[in-house]
Amino acid sequence: MKKAWILLLTALMALSFCACQSKTETPAAPAAPAAPAAPATEAAQTAEETPARKAQVVQTGSGITVMTAEDWAGKYPEIYKSYLANNDNKEVHDYTKDYPMIPIIYEGMAFSKFYGSARGHTYTVEDVTSTGRPHKLANCFTCKTPDYTAMVNEMGDAAYQMTFEDALAQINESISCYNCHANTGNELVVTHTYLADAMGDDLQNVDPATLACGQCHVEYYFAPQTKATTLPYQNLATMTPDAILDYYNRTIVDGQPFADYTNPRTGVRQIKVQHPEFETYMGAGSVHKDTFTCADCHMGEATAADGTTYISHTWISPLENKALMENTCSQCHTDLTGQVRAIQQETERRTYAVGYLLEGLTEKLALAVESGEYTEEELNGIRAVARDAQFYWDFVFVENSEGAHNSALDSDCLDKAEALANQAMGMFK
């Protein structure tokens, strides 16, 4: 049920903004913000503009002006048209209806009230402002708009402490060219510096066409003191679910491990995982991470009426890209669509099963707290195990590919979530 339309969302929400499918042709994703030069008027969307494959990081400082997608339309008309085609993805699903355990599992945070599916990059500002959930700080705009990305690059951590409304007044468009290209037009640039900070020297070990997507399709948290968007690792080796959980458990805030929220009935200090597509795809067990970038699968090469080739910026599932399926995927897969759907069905089955187990654990722990029959030490022991169980489940639930990006990692996370939930159940009197 969750995302019966997942094959589209896997592309629209999961992994996007990248470079080329054919690494020798046409423009792709981000680049460092230079002073905005007026874009050229001719549609120079040819191989001469192929970006270098070395990771670039945005130059921060004052005087940053964002060039909008429309500003680039004259130079890249076909790419611009393909970008606007993302507007067709209008449907929103409320996950709290599709997954009835969510209001219990997420109790204590806004997602328990409404959890809408993402509609893609052209709707990010509209979606974050119309959730019905209160937003205090501007950091909610991280990865929602190039305007806020530029604010952070110009102001530093001070931008994270702006109010939501003050930032909104300065926002003009949803995710667009600057997020992945800065103001360069066709080069790939890491414009979200927290990714570069977290990757360290490993930044150069990942293709820029994957880094472009990995800027936003990641697990992150807001640092308690600065409210800055922060990734919970230091390199590729510490980007695993186990290491990330350990990071959070070792990050002490007011004498207790970091938490995104606390369940009001159980007292469990919960971690709310975001959308760890980057960590999942780059993780152990990933079959394609060393061969294909995010863009290779989700941004196909297209041909304009005049014969010009360009990279489509309509983010789709690779299963919807007939040329990719026939010319590339078929070399190894005889029935990739059937294989992917089988993986997704099994992942969904287990996600529901473990989710209901966590719902039952939450209710049982709430009763234990209310009963007064347990010492605080006993309750804290159960809470610690329940916290870890939910983390592993959430890592899969919110990743958006239903196991397609890395079924081995997702299966391992669900195994751990199930084992920990059962362990916690066994701790009751």
Outline where the language-model segments fall:
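Positively charged n-region of N-terminal signal peptides that target proteins for export
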Residues: M1-A4
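Sec-dependent N-terminal signal peptides
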Residues: I6-M13
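Primarily the internal scaffold of c-type cytochrome electron-transfer domains
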Residues: T24-A118, N153-S174, N179, T184-D296, ...
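Long, composition-driven intrinsically disordered regions
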Residues: P103, G108-T129, K136, P146
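Membrane-entry segments of alpha-helical transmembrane domains in multi-pass membrane proteins
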Residues: Y123-K136, Q161-I171
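Active-site-adjacent structural elements in enzyme catalytic domains
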Residues: R133-A138, T145-Y148, Q170-E173, A182
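Glycine-rich active-site/cofactor-binding loop and its immediate structural neighborhood
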Residues: C143, V152
